Every structure is written in structure tokens, then in C-alpha cells.
Amino acid sequence: MQFIFKTSVVIFLCVVLGYLHADEVFTHKDWSVTTYDSDPEFIKYSTHGSAVWGHEFGFLKRAGSCDEDNIYVSWSSTVKLDQLKEMEDQKVLFDLHPDEQFFQFAVPNLVVNPLLGSEYLEIPNSLNVMLFTNYFPQVTFSPSLEAGRRISVKVNEKDPHHRNFDIPDDEFSLEGYIAARQFAVEQCEIRTQALKIKNQYKITMR
């Protein structure tokens, strides 16, 4: 089950990194909820960094497991792609401070891809994006976010991969977190029911 989930997440994140077919379906204050036509099982709710807008902190929900929140961290780096690729499938230790509280999570790095420009977006320097996910925080983490106003996310200085991060820390607003999470739950439940109906239809058509 773990392997199947991980494989699905990798496929999904490849789509996310390409910013393909993304549909921002809900926004409240600093948080938004995004769905993907190419992989409708996943719902992402997240916010952007205050130091680097391209840094993203949030969670993934998957249809069929709506009570689970899979942490999602996106980080950019100008370190050479080959060096960053060596970090794939490795865990990176993050220090997280929602207001005065402290948590420490070792989150797997599943995907590293270059951020490519387009006719609408020019990227002058080589920029790579790293995705960290497939980690489900302890149950006390979400209540701390609900009660907080901001969260700082930092790569632990003793982590061997710390050198791969140009900017190893950032702050994220928690304004809008509660509403975004609730909307993500609702979307997840709707999609779960749709999948059940689809699967039942497949069975009856056999």
C-alpha cells in the first residue's frame, strides 16, 4: 500500500511541477485549494512563503482517505540539478514553529525537477524545484496550525542536505488555513463518493 501510494504521489507531483491543468477552486485569505484534472484523486491546500513566493507549504488529501493530511513542502534551489537529484528518496529534517510551538519532521524528497520558463515567464537563472511529501504529521500538529497565526519552516542546520538550500528557511501565514482545510475535506468527500459510484458501475458492467 505504501508503495502504491508513493507511486501515485510521484505521478501527481510530476504534474504539479509542470503546473499542468491546475484549477484553484477556493481561496480564503492566504490559503488556497487546488485540484488537478489529470489526477482528480488529489486535493492540495497550501500557502506561499513570505521570503520566496515559490516556496509552498501545505497538505495533500486523497480521495478515500479524507481524514489524512499528507504534508506538502515545495522549495526552490539554484544548486545544480545533478547534486539535488542525489537527494531524491532521502529524508530532510525540517524544524517547524507554529507560533511558539515546535515540531520536527523528517520528510521524504520525492521529486526534483528544473523549473522551465515559457513565453509568459522568463527564468534567467537555473532554478530547480524540490517536492517533499509522503509524511503524515502527528495528530497534534493540525490543532497547532488552527490556533496559530504564522509558521516558520526551516531545514535543520545539522541535516546533511542543508547545503542544497539557497534559502533554508521561510515563514508562512496561517490566515485562512482552517477554511482551506475544511473546503479540501469537502472536496475529498465528494470525490470519494464519485469514485465509489464509478467503481460500482464498473462492477455492474462486467
Residue spans for each PLM region:
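Hydrophobic h-region of N-terminal signal peptides that target proteins for export
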Residues: 12-21
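Bacterial N-terminal signal peptides that target proteins for export
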Residues: 1-9
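A generic "folded-domain core" signal
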Residues: 22-206
